[in-house]
């Protein structure tokens, strides 16, 4: 009798996704995009389709495509079974330093940033 191996896909939690996104560093500010407060919303369905709403420091950020590629790369490395990764930017609430996490502000202060 032949048995087939069934691969079970475990959908990552929002926390696991955020943890993976901490590997994505902003190329200009020495912090990751999670601690910078760039991630506004994460949705994932049971089929493995992921949708992220994010922001950047400005709506004309020259590093947007680099950050998108880095996000997709980090998520595909950690969760190769994800089917679709959609990243949209929302600039309706302009980013400012208030969005930086407490941990992020501490790291920046250690590096000499006045924040």
Tell me the role of every PLM-derived stretch.
Residues 1-115:
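Domain-level signature for proteins that mediate thiol-based redox and metal-cofactor handling
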